[in-house]
From Swiss-Prot:
Protein name: DNA-directed RNA polymerase subunit beta
Catalytic activity: RNA(n) + a ribonucleoside 5'-triphosphate = RNA(n+1) + diphosphate
Annotated GO MF terms: DNA binding; DNA-directed RNA polymerase activity; ribonucleoside binding
The organism's place on the tree of life at top rank: Bacteria
Subunit structure: The RNAP catalytic core consists of 2 alpha, 1 beta, 1 beta' and 1 omega subunit. When a sigma factor is associated with the core the holoenzyme is formed, which can initiate transcription.
Entries under Gene3D superfamilies matching the protein: 2.40.50.100, 2.40.50.150, 3.90.1100.10, DNA-directed RNA polymerase, beta subunit, external 1 domain, DNA-directed RNA polymerase, subunit 2, domain 6, RNA polymerase alpha subunit dimerisation domain, RNA polymerase Rpb2, domain 2
NCBIfam families reported in the protein's UniProt record: PRK00405.1 (NF001616), rpoB (TIGR02013)
Keyword terms of this UniProt record: DNA-directed RNA polymerase, Nucleotidyltransferase, Transcription, Transferase
Annotated EC: 2.7.7.6
Organism classification: Bacteria, Pseudomonadati, Bacteroidota, Flavobacteriia, Flavobacteriales
Protein species of origin: Karelsulcia muelleri (strain GWSS)
Cited Pfam families: RNA_pol_Rpb2_1, RNA_pol_Rpb2_2, RNA_pol_Rpb2_3, RNA_pol_Rpb2_45, RNA_pol_Rpb2_6, RNA_pol_Rpb2_7
Length: 1328
C-alpha cells in the first residue's frame, strides 16, 4: 500500500537578502502542517499508518464491520468480511493529469462464506461431502486517492473535498419568545443517526416530547413506558414525593398534606378493574383519612413538606404533566405511544414494547461525539463506547430542562464552536462508503436467497459496481467536492483549508440568518474573522486560522501557553484546547509579556473571558496566545500593517490575493509579514535539496545533484548518488494559468540540505511572490484616476512587469459514425497549401507554431450523406476511380480572438490489434530490463551484507521456506555468503550475535525490498500503458489535444489591486517621459487616487508605501507580522537612514511641462497584483444570438453570447440627454420588438430607410398576465387631423363591461354542461 508522503519542508539557508523583523513577540512555536486537515483525515480513514490490532474500529474497516456478516433468510449461510487490501495506483500523478484519468487505488476485500450447521451435500458424481468454508478475494472497486499535496485527481482535473462545519450531535437547550406569554423552553437531542427528539414545555407548564416533528406525548407517558409505572415512581425520580405508612395512631400528622398519587380500593396492580378512591393533588382532611383507613390502605404517597409551592417549577411541571397523562400503567403507555407513532394498534404489549425500545434506543445512535457532548452538558460519566441513548440521559435532560425553566441554567449558544464540529474528508468518505456498502449488502441479501446455496461463492454474491458509482458521483457532483482553485499557490492552500457550512446536511444560503453568519467569540484562533466571501455566502464559508487544528472528534482547537502565578511557561509545549475547554478561562494576547526571558507579564492586562474583555491582575490569567497572528488565516496573515486597515478592506485584500495571476517575472514583497517563506514550502512543484551536495548539471527541464552521503547512508541506500529532478514545464492549471518552474542553481554550485533549487509559479528564492514592487504616487492625474482607476507607466508594460502566461486547451474527437469513420488528416478539402504549412502529417498544428484567428488547429474530415452524383462527379470518378465530395471538412479552427503559440500536442487512441506484435516485443524488452535491474540489486545486496557480516559467527540463517541455509556457529565469509545468498529468497532474523550488525542487516534488507517494490510498480505501470492503451470513453476512437500559450501584457481594462483591498482598473497607459517624476529625474510607475484612502480607512497601504521605499533604497526586506508590526517611529528611523523625506511626502514634477506641483505628494514603493479579471476575457459584443422564449429579449452574459443590460438608470440618462430616437430604438428594435427587428434587418440589407418600431413583446406579456387575472385590456388609436400635422394619441382603458361579459360567458358554459349531464342521466335511467 502506497503511503501519502508529505511534501518536504526544510528550513531555508541564509540568503543574501537581508531581512529586518519588527516583531516584538518571537514565535516560540513553529507553524503546524497546513495540509494536516486534508492528509491526516484521509490517512486515518484508510488506516494507512495503523497496525492491524488498532484497525478494528477505525475508518474504512469500521464500514465493513457495520454491515457484515450477512445471512440468508433461513440463517443457513453466512458471508463475513475478513480484511481488505489497497493496491498502488496504476498511473502516476503526472500521467493522470495529462491523460485526463483518475488517480485512484484498487481495493480488494477478503470474504468467507460458511454454513451455520454441518450438512452433507450431493455433488455431480453423486458423492457426498460437507459444505466447506470458502475464502475468496473480491475486487471491491476503486477509490480516488489523495495526492501528497492534499488534493484528488478526478478525470484529469485536481479537486478538493472541502471540510463541512455542521451542528454537533448531542443535546442543546434553548428558549424562544411568544408575544405577551412566558418563554417556551426546549431541549433538542440530535443523534448521529436517527431522528431528532425534542422535549419542550408549553404555556401551561406541561412538558411534552416531540417525535417525528408532529407527534407529541406527555413526558410522563414515556417514563411509564420505560418502567416508571406508578406516579410515585415518576415523582421519586425528581425527589418530590415520599411514601408513608398510615394508621389510626399517626394519621393526624398527615392532615393538610397533599396526595402525590392516586389511591385505589385494592392492590395497585389491579387498578384497571377497580375504582379510584382518591385523585392525586388532594389536601388530606379527616373524611379522606376515614376512607383510606376504611379500605385498609397502609401506604400512601405524599408530596414532601414545603415542596408544594405554585412558584416551584419542578413541582408545577411534573404535576401538570401527570394531569395531562392519559395512561396509568406501563402497558397502557406502550400501547398509547405505539398508536401515536404508527397510527395503528399493536397486536400485543410485547410488540409495542419492542417498537419503543428500538425507536428510542437502538435507532438513536449518538456516536462518540454525541456521547462526549451529552456527558459534558449533563455532567454524566458514561464511557465513550456507550453510544446509544439511555434512560439516565432522558431523566437528566428533563432535570436540566426544568432548571432552564427555573432560570437556574443558561441557554446554549448554537453558533458557538463548542456546539459545531468539522466533517473532514475522511468522515465524508466514510458516509459515502456506508451508503455504497448498504446497497451492496442489499444485493447480497437478494442473491443469497435466490441462488443455489450449495454452490455459493463470495464472487457470485458481491457486485462492487454500485459502490464505485456512489463514490464517483460523490467526487464528481457533490457540493463539497470542488474544482480546485489553482490560480496561485495561496488560492490552492486556502481552498484546502476552507470550512463550509453549506452542503448536504448543512445550511442553505437562503435560510441562513445573520446570527449564524456573524463572528462568534469562540472563533478566536480557530476560524478567521476576516476571510470570507463577499456575496450570498458571507459568513457561511470560512478559513482555518494559522495555528488551528481539528481534533479526533472534529472540534477546532487552538494553542495557548499556560500561565502559572503570572509567569508564562515558555519552556513547555503549548496546549491545544477546544472552545468548550476554553469556557470561563482568562486569556491574554501574545504581546502582554513584559520580559521574554523570564515570561513575566505586565501588571494589569486586558484579557478575554468568553465574550467579555475585562482588565485583571496578571496573577489571575490562565493562558496566553502563542502568536499575534493566531487570530487570522493564512491570507489575512500575509497583509502587512493589517492592524491599520478597516476589516471590510482587509477582507477584500485577503480575497484578492487569491485571485492574483502568477507573473512571468514575479518578485517577493519588500514589505512582508514573514509567512511568505513558510507558505512557499507547500508549493508542490518546488524542489529542495535532500542533503548537502554539488549540482552536476542544469538545463531547463532537469537538475542533477550529486549528494555527499555518509558511510552509513552509502551502506543502507540502494539509490544512485546522482539524483535527477524533473522540472514542471508549462503545465495548464485549473484556472488556465501557467505552472512553469525554472532552475535558480548553476552547474558546480554547492547546495545545502533544504536549499531551494528552482522557482516559478508565484515564488522567488523560496518566497511567495504574487506580484511586483512598484513605485507609486498618491495624486490626481488629469482625471484619469477618477473612482479608483489606475494610471500606469509604459515602462511597466515594456519591461513585462505584469505580463502573465495563460494556457488554453483545445480538443477534437474522432468517432465511428453510421456513414463511416472520421479521420485526422493533413489533406483537408478546399484548403490552401499555405495554410497547411503549420500542420503535421496527422493534421495537427506543429509545436512552436504561432496561432492566428482562422488557423486550423486540428484537421478532421467526416463522411457525409451521398446524393445523386452530378455529371462532373461522374466524370471525376471515371478518371480517378474514387468518389469525390463524400467527405466534409469538420476541422477545429482558431476563433476570432485567439493569438498564441502551440506548446504541446497529444493524440490518444484506443488499442488496435495491428499493434499487438509490436506491443508484445516491447513487453519482453521491459521484462528483460527489469530482470537485469533485479540481478544488479541482488549483487549490490550481497556486497553490502558481506561488508557487514564477514568474519561474524552465524546464528542460523533461514530462507523464505524457513530452511537453514547457513548453519549456526559457522564463520561467515565472502565465498559461503555469495554461494548461499545468490539464489535464495532472503528473510530477516537475528543472523549473528551482534545487535548493531543485526540492526544494519535488517535495514539493508528492508531498503532492498522497498527498491524491488518500486521497480515492480514502474514495470506494472509501463506494461499497463502498453496493454490497455489510452483510456478513452466508449464511442470515441481518437482524441487530439492542442495546448496554446497566450502571453498577456497589462492592458487598459485589466484589474489590479494591492494587499489592502485597494483595487482598481487600469485606465490609461502613459509614456514614461509623461509620468510625474522626482527631483532626481526618476519617474513614478503608478499613480493612485489619494481619495481612495481616507474613506476606505485602509491606511496600511500608506505605511507599506513609505517603508517599501526605504527598503528599496537600502536594498533590504522587512518583516512586519500582523498586530506586531513596525511603528511610525521605526519606519521614520529607516526613512532617515535612506535619506528619504518623512512619511514619503515629496514634491513631484509634471512629466509634460516640467513644472513643480504645488503640494507635496506621498511617494513610495507598493506591492501590486494583477488579478485574474482581464479585459481580454471580459470584452464581448453581440451581433446575433439567442433570445428568451417568454420576453423575446436577448439573453445575458458572454457565455450565452448575450446582450448588454440597459436598466432604468441608463434609461434616465438617455432621457436626460433628450436622446428620444436612440431610446426608442433600444427599447424596441434592439430588445423585444419581434416584427420590428426583422423589418429593420431587411431594411439594412436592402439599404432602405429603417421603419418605425412596433409594440415590444414585454407589453404583450403584460397583456397576457392581465388576461390571466380576468382583465380585458384594449388599445385604441385615435387620429385627429389638424391643419399642419397629424397627432396620434394612445388611450388604454380597462372596461368593466368586458369583465361582466366574460363572467356571463363562463356561467353560460357551466349551465350548458349541467344540462348535458342531466340529459345523459335521464337517458340512462330510462334505459334501466
Amino acid at each position: 500500500m502506497k503511503k501519502i508522503i508529505k511534501i518536504r519542508r526544510f528550513k531555508f539557508p541564509f540568503t543574501k537578502e537581508k531581512t529586518i523583523n519588527f516583531a516584538s513577540v518571537r514565535n516560540k512555536i513553529s507553524y503546524p502542517d497546513f495540509l494536516d486537515i486534508q492528509i491526516k483525515s484521509f490517512t486515518n480513514f484508510f488506516c494507512i499508518n495503523y497496525t492491524y490490532k488498532n484497525i478494528s474500529n477505525k475508518g474504512f474497516y469500521k464500514v465493513f464491520i457495520e454491515y457484515f456478516p450477512i445471512s440468508d433468510s433461513k440463517n443457513k449461510f453466512i458471508i463475513d468480511f475478513i480484511s481488505y487490501k489497497i493496491y498502488d495506483p496504476l498511473y502516476s500523478i503526472e500521467e493522470c493529469i495529462k491523460r485526463g484519468l483518475t488517480y485512484n487505488v484498487y481495493i480488494r476485500a477478503r470474504f468467507k462464506i460458511y454454513r451455520t450447521r454441518k450438512r452433507k451435500i450431493t455433488i455431480e458424481n453423486k458423492r457426498t461431502k460437507y459444505f466447506e468454508t470458502i475464502y475468496q478475494d473480491v475486487y471491491f472497486g476503486t477509490c480516488p486517492y489523495m495526492t501528497p499535496s492534499g488534493s484528488f485527481i478526478f478525470n484529469g482535473s485536481e479537486r478538493v473535498i472541502v471540510s463541512q462545519l455542521h451542528r454537533s450531535p448531542g443535546v442543546f437547550f434553548g428558549q424562544y419568545d411568544i408575544p405577551n406569554l412566558p418563554k417556551i423552553s426546549y431541549a433538542r437531542i440530535i443523534p448521529l443517526k436517527g431522528s431528532w427528539i425534542e422535549l419542550s414545555t408549553d404555556i401551561n407548564n406541561v412538558m411534552y416530547i416531540y417525535l417525528d416533528i408532529k407527534k407529541r406525548l406527555p413526558i410522563t407517558t414515556l417514563l411509564r413506558a420505560l418502567g416508571y409505572t406508578r406516579d410515585i415512581d415518576i415523582l421519586n425520580i425528581f425527589n418530590l414525593a415520599e411514601e408513608v405508612n398510615i394508621n389510626k395512631v399517626n394519621y393526624k400528622k398527615f392532615l393538610g398534606r397533599t396526595l402525590a398519587a392516586r389511591i385505589f380500593k385494592t392492590s395497585y396492580q389491579k387498578f384497571e378493574e377497580n375504582d379510584i378512591l382518591l385523585e392525586r393533588n388532594i389536601k388530606l382532611k379527616k373524611y379522606h383519612i376515614d376512607i383510606i383507613l376504611y379500605y385498609k390502605i397502609k401506604v400512601i404517597s405524599l408530596y414532601k413538606k414545603n415542596e408544594k409551592n405554585e412558584k416551584n417549577l419542578y413541582y408545577s411541571i411534573i404535576h401538570n404533566t401527570l394531569k395531562k397523562d392519559p395512561t396509568n400503567s406501563q402497558k397502557e403507555a406502550n400501547i398509547y405511544i405505539y398508536k401515536e407513532l404508527k397510527d395503528s394498534f399493536p397486536k400485543n404489549d410485547k410488540k409495542a414494547k419492542l417498537f419503543i425500545n428500538k425507536f428510542f434506543f437502538d435507532e438513536t445512535h449518538l456516536g462518540e461525539v454525541g456521547r462526549y457532548k451529552l456527558n459534558k452538558t449533563l455532567k454524566l460519566d458514561f464511557p465513550l463506547k456507550d453510544q446509544i441513548l439511555n434512560i439516565e440521559d432522558i431523566i437528566s435532560i428533563i432535570e436540566n430542562l426544568i432548571a432552564l425553566c427555573n432560570n437556574k441554567k443558561e441557554v446554549d449558544d448554537i453558533d458557538n464552536l463548542a456546539n459545531r464540529r468539522v466533517k473532514t474528508v475522511g468522515e465524508q468518505l466514510y458516509t459515502q462508503y456506508t451508503i455504497g456498502i448498504a446497497r451492496v449488502s442489499r444485493i447480497i441479501k437478494e442473491r443469497i436467497n435466490v441462488k443455489d446455496n450449495e454452490t455459493l461463492t463470495p464472487l457470485e454474491l458481491i457486485n462492487s459496481k454500485t459502490l464505485t458509482s456512489v463514490i464517483n458521483s460523490f467526487f464528481g457532483t457533490d457540493e463539497l467536492s470542488q474544482f480546485m482553485d489553482q490560480t496561485n499557490p495561496l488560492a490552492e492552500m486556502t481552498h484546502k483549508r476552507r470550512i463550509s457550512s453549506l452542503g448536504p446536511g448543512g445550511l442553505s444560503r437562503e435560510r441562513a440568518g445573520f446570527e449564524i453568519r456573524d463572528v462568534n467569540y469562540s472563533h478566536y484562533g480557530r476560524l478567521c474573522p476576516i476571510e470570507t466571501p463577499e456575496g450570498p455566502n458571507i459568513g457561511l464559508i470560512s478559513s482555518l486560522c494559522v495555528f488551528a487544528k481539528i481534533n479526533s472528534m472534529g472540534f477546532i482547537e487552538t494553542p495557548y501557553f499556560k500561565v502559572k502565578k503570572g509567569k508564562v511557561v515558555i519552556n513547555e509545549a503549548p496546549i491545544y484546547i477546544s472552545s468548550d475547554q476554553e469556557y470561563g478561562k482568562l486569556i491574554t494576547q501574545a504581546n502582554a509579556i513584559l520580559n521574554y526571558k523570564t515570561g513575566v507579564l505586565k501588571n494589569n492586562i486586558i484579557v478575554r473571558v468568553n465574550a467579555d474583555f475585562p482588565m485583571v491582575n496578571y496573577k489571575k490569567i490562565n493562558y496566553i496566545d502563542v502568536s499575534t497572528n493566531q487570530i487570522a488565516s493564512i491570507s489575512a496573515s500575509l497583509i502587512p500593517f493589517l492592524e491599520h486597515d478597516d476589516a471590510n478592506r482587509a477582507l477584500m485584500g485577503s480575497n484578492m490575493m487569491r485571485q492574483s495571476v502568477p507573473l512571468l517575472n514575479p518578485k517577493a514583497p519588500i514589505v512582508g509579514t514573514g509567512l511568505e517563506k513558510h507558505l512557499a514550502q507547500y508549493v508542490n512543484a518546488l524542489i529542495y535539496a535532500e542533503g548537502d551536495g554539488i549540482v552536476e548539471s542544469v538545463d531547463a527541464n532537469n537538475i542533477k545533484v550529486k549528494y555527499f552521503n555518509s558511510e552509513k547512508e552509502k551502506l543502507l541506500s540502494f539509490e544512485k548518488r546522482i539524483k535527477t529532478y524533473k522540472l514542471i514545464k508549462f503545465r495548464k492549471t485549473n484556472q488556465n494559468t501557467c505552472l512553469n518552474i525554472r532552475p535558480i542553481v548553476k552547474k558546480g554550485m554547492y547546495v545545502t540540505k533544504g536549499q531551494v533549487l528552482c522557482e516559478g509559479f508565484a515564488t522567488q528564492n523560496g518566497k511567495l511572490a504574487l506580484g511586483r514592487n512598484i513605485k507609486v504616487a498618491f495624486m490626481p492625474f488629469k482625471g484619469y484616476n477618477f473612482e479608483d482607476a489606475i494610471v500606469i507607466s509604459e515602462k511597466v508594460v515594456r519591461e513585462d512587469w505584469f505580463t502573465s502566461i495563460h494556457i488554453d486547451e483545445y480538443s477534437l474527437e474522432v468517432r465511428d459514425t453510421k456513414l463511416g469513420m472520421e479521420e485526422f488528416t493533413f489533406d483537408i478539402p478546399n484548403f490552401n497549401e499555405e495554410n497547411k504549412k503549420k500542420l503535421d502529417k496527422y493534421g495537427i498544428i506543429k509545436i512552436g507554431s504561432e496561432v492566428k484567428p482562422g488557423d486550423v488547429l486540428i484537421g478532421r474530415i467526416t463522411p457525409k450523406k451521398e446524393g445523386y452524383p452530378s455529371s462532373e462527379e461522374n466524370f471525376l470518378k471515371a478518371i480517378f476511380g474514387k468518389k469525390v465530395g463524400t467527405i466534409k471538412n469538420t476541422s477545429l479552427k482558431a476563433d476570432s480572438s485567439l493569438f498564441g503559440v502551440v506548446i504541446d500536442t497529444k493524440i490518444y487512441s484506443k488499442f488496435s490489434s495491428k499493434e499487438d506484435e509490436q506491443k508484445q516485443f516491447q513487453i519482453k524488452k521491459l521484462n528483460n530490463k527489469f530482470m537485469k535491474n533485479l540481478k544488479l540489486l541482488r549483487k549490490l545486496l550481497i556486497n553490502k551484507l558481506i561488508l557487514v557480516l564477514e568474519g561474524s559467527v552465524s546464528e542460523g540463517i533461514l530462507n523464505s521456506s524457513y530452511k537453514e541455509i547457513i548453519p549456526k556457529g559457522k564463520i561467515l565469509n565472502k565465498l559461503n555468503l555469495k554461494k548461499l545468498l545468490k539464489n535464495q529468497e532472503i528473510i530477516y532474523q537475528n543472523w549473528v550475535n551482534n545487535k548493531y550488525k543485526n540492526n544494519l542487516v535488517f535495514k539493508i534488507i528492508k531498503f532492498y525490498y522497498l527498491k524491488i517494490n518500486e521497480l515492480k510498480i514502474k514495470l506494472k505501470r509501463k506494461k499497463n500503458r502498453l496493454l490497455i492503451g489510452d483510456e478513452i470513453t466508449s464511442g470515441i476512437i481518437k482524441i487530439a489535444k492542442v495546448l496554446i500559450a497566450k502571453k498577456r501584457k497589462l492592458k487598459v481594462g485589466d484589474k489590479m489591486s494591492g494587499r489592502h483591498g485597494n483595487k482598481g482598473i487600469v485606465a490609461r497607459i502613459v509614456k514614461e517621459e509623461d509620468m510625474p517624476y522626482l527631483e532626481d529625474g526618476t519617474s513614478v510607475d503608478l499613480v493612485l487616487n489619494p481619495l481612495g484612502v481616507p474613506s476606505r480607512m485602509n491606511l496600511g497601504q500608506i505605511y507599506e508605501t513609505i517603508l517599501g521605499w526605504a527598503g528599496e533604497k537600502l536594498g533590504i526586506n522587512f518583516s512586519t507580522p500582523i498586530f506586531d508590526g513596525a511603528s511610525i517611529e521605526e519606519i521614520s528611523k529607516y526613512t532617515d537612514i535612506a535619506n528619504l523625506p518623512s512619511f514619503g511626502n515629496t514634491y513631484l514634477f509634471d512629466g509634460e511641462t516640467g513644472e513643480k506641483f504645488d503640494q507635496p505628494v506621498t511617494v513610495g514603493v507598493i506591492y501590486m497584483l494583477k488579478l485574474n479579471h482581464m479585459v481580454d476575457d471580459k470584452m464581448h459584443a453581440r451581433s446575433i444570438g439567442p433570445y428568451s422564449l417568454i420576453t423575446q429579449q436577448p439573453l445575458g452574459g458572454k457565455s450565452k453570447f448575450g446582450g448588454q443590460r440597459l436598466g432604468e438608470m441608463e434609461v434616465w440618462a438617455l432621457e436626460a440627454f433628450g436622446a428620444a430616437n436612440i431610446l426608442r430604438e433600444i427599447l424596441t428594435v434592439k430588445s423585444d420588438d419581434v416584427k420590428g427587428r426583422t423589418k429593420t434587418y431587411e431594411a439594412i440589407v436592402k439599404r432602405e430607410t429603417i421603419p418605425n418600431p412596433g409594440i415590444p413583446e414585454s407589453f404583450h406579456v403584460l397583456l397576457k398576465e392581465l388576461k390571466g387575472l380576468g382583465l380585458s385590456l384594449k388599445l385604441e388609436v385615435i387620429k385627429k387631423k389638424e391643419k399642419k400635422n397629424q397627432k396620434i394619441k394612445v388611450r388604454i382603458e380597462i372596461k368593466e363591461k368586458d369583465i361582466i361579459k366574460y363572467k356571463k360567458k363562463v356561467k353560460e358554459i357551466k349551465l350548458k354542461k349541467l344540462k348535458e349531464l342531466k340529459e345523459q342521466l335521464s337517458k340512462s335511467n330510462k334505459k334501466k
